[in-house]
Amino acid sequence: MNSFPWLTTIVVLPIFAGSLIFLFPHRGNKVIRWYTICISMIELLLMTYVFFYHFQPDDPLIQLVEDYKWINFFDFHWRLGIDGLSIGPILLTGFITTLATLAAWPVTRNSQLFHFLMLAMYSAQIGLFSSRDLLLFFIMWELELIPVYLLLSMWGGKKRLYSATKFILYTAGGSIFLLMGVLGVGLYGSNEPTLNLETLVNQSYPVALEIIFYIGFFIAFAVKLPIIPLHTWLPDTHGEAHYSTCMLLAGILLKMGAYGLVRINMELLPHAHSIFSPWLMIIGTMQIIYAASTSPGQRNLKKRIAYSSVSHMGFIIIGISSITDTGLNGAILQIISHGFIGAALFFLAGTSYDRIRLVYLDEMGGIAIPMPKIFTLFSSFSMASLALPGMSGFIAELIVFFGLITSQKYLLIPKLLITFGMAIGMILTPIYLLSMSRQMFYGYKLFNISNSSFFDSGPRELFVSTSIFLPVIGIGVYPDLVLSLSVEKVEAILSNYFYR
């Protein structure tokens, strides 16, 4: 137990430092950009320091616990703590947000507000991943939505208001169910609300009530980690948002749904989860095939990448519903891996849009000749996304496969059918990714504009892309980097499932 409140510092620092941006003089955007990047870097370094020196990965209990009484009236605490499950997403958040602030250099309009919103999002995400109180979890979940809505509706594309409204309707509608679930779980069986996650893990419910709670939480998380048919906000949002916002959306926002699914639905409601997991398995397989076959029909480049990320979320659902150590570890690895790969793909799509000002794939072509570096990076990340061995996507999907096959819960025929479905999805993934690459970079289309406006990626773009590419290769070569953090915690979660 540390005396210094490390986690509170990590959560509060970005939004506190971001609110100082408005005190800056209005002279230049450069000061604001450098200030934001420095804050993100300091935050990332602080995070790594704390987790290196004060976190033991082989301990499945909650560490770095902080508990301050906040509202005496109904026993509401500011309660933070991390374990092996939340440390991966927290570090991913720090990494991706730092690179997204670096990717937002071209933003000049209202840059004070833009960078403040980026930092506010940073705080809310880390608060969500480290909160140990259900109501605090809900507050951070809601605090996330406001910056995304503003970033969408102010710095988006042509149809930005439509997609921002769609986003806020979907996610706020999901949050209603989340709030009802939080209140139901907290108020069950006592006059005093118990919101502490530690005590709620040991709470047992009647099966019917547990199923109702499970459905409520599941709808809220299914909107965020888009599970079909609640996924339609995602392609619109990604098609319109500025690409630094897209990096945050694809890298972290989608992972909040998966994290909530593991943290609340698996830990708090194990009986209902083992009842629902066959259906989840079917939904995940359907989602892999559906999104992978919808993706080639999209003209918009960003929408195509968005559908590919919906398809990759199917592997996370299958890993979570396999109820094995291997499957859940693979799902966590896929969370981290897709966080890197999705963010990089959206970043490269955005930078190439900045170069050529074309969104639709059938208008592009032949870009590989003037822009070889972007072509190389885009091809590499496409390979990582279609699970080439040696990259992180391959090892994550392989571990999910193993988890499904070794699962005690399912019979042989369902396992074979689901494996067959996953294999169909894995065949469709190279089809849309390689056709996307072909339509963008190959071909003979000569542009009407003069070639003077084409310059290859500068040092900033190269730095962002390579610094995302290194962890992808690193996790692919040595996946224990991520797995060693979560493996003890996964065993602790699955020890509740004694009737697997």
From Swiss-Prot:
GO CC field: chloroplast thylakoid membrane
Transmembrane regions listed in the UniProt entry: 4-24, 35-55, 87-107, 111-131, 134-154, 167-187, 208-228, 242-262, 272-292, 305-325, 330-350, 386-406, 416-436
Keyword entries, A-Z: Chloroplast, Membrane, NAD, NADP, Plastid, Plastoquinone, Quinone, Thylakoid, Translocase, Transmembrane, Transmembrane helix
Signal peptide as annotated in the record: none
Annotated InterPro entries: NADH_Q_OxRdtase_chain4, NADH_Q_OxRdtase_chainM/4, NADH_UbQ_OxRdtase, ND/Mrp_TM
Catalysed reaction, written as an equation: a plastoquinone + NADH + (n+1) H(+)(in) = a plastoquinol + NAD(+) + n H(+)(out); a plastoquinone + NADPH + (n+1) H(+)(in) = a plastoquinol + NADP(+) + n H(+)(out)
EC number(s) from the headed UniProt entry: 7.1.1.-
Subcellular location: Plastid, Chloroplast thylakoid membrane
GO-annotated biological processes: aerobic respiration; ATP synthesis coupled electron transport; electron transport coupled proton transport
Family listed: Belongs to the complex I subunit 4 family.
HAMAP family listed in its UniProt record: NDH1_NuoM
Protein name: NAD(P)H-quinone oxidoreductase chain 4, chloroplastic
Organism: Spinacia oleracea (Spinach)
